[in-house]
C-alpha cells in the first residue's frame, strides 16, 4: 500500500503479504487508483550515491516507487494517494511445457481446492 509520498514525487510503501523486499529494486509495479492503473518501478539508491561503509540490503526505508512524476501534485493528478494498492507486474507462464509459474499460484490453487 502507498504509505507516504515525498514532495518530489517518490512513493514509499507498506508491505502487505509475503513479498520479499530484497526482490523489489527494478521491479515494475501497478499502482491501483480510482482513475485506473498507473505504471511505476521500484527504485533503490544507485551504488555511487550509497554510503558503502554501511551498504545495507534494500528495505522499506530505502526503496521507493517512481511513476515518472516531477512532484507530489503530479502524482495526485494521476490519482495516486496514501492507501492506493500496489502490485507487482506479473504474468502466468509455463516452464518446459510442464510447470506452471505465477504469482501466489499456491494460494489460488489452494482456494480453488477448498471451494471444490
List each model region and its residues.
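N-terminal hydrophobic/helix-forming segments and targeting peptides
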Residues: 1-116
Amino acid at each position: 500500500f502507498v504509505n507516504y509520498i515525498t514532495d518530489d514525487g517518490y512513493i514509499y510503501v507498506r508491505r502487505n503479504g509475503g513479498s520479499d523486499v530484497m526482490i523489489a529494486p527494478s521491479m515494475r509495479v501497478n499502482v491501483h487508483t480510482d482513475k485506473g492503473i498507473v505504471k511505476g518501478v521500484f527504485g533503490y539508491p544507485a551504488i555511487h550515491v550509497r554510503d558503502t561503509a554501511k551498504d545495507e540490503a534494500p528495505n522499506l526505508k530505502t526503496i521507493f516507487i517512481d511513476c515518472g512524476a516531477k512532484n507530489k501534485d503530479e502524482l495526485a493528478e494521476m490519482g495516486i494517494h496514501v492507501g492506493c494498492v500496489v502490485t507487482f507486474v506479473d504474468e502466468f507462464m509455463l516452464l518446459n511445457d510442464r510447470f506452471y509459474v505465477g504469482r501466489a499460484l499456491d494460494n489460488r490453487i489452494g482456494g480453488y481446492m477448498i471451494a471444490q
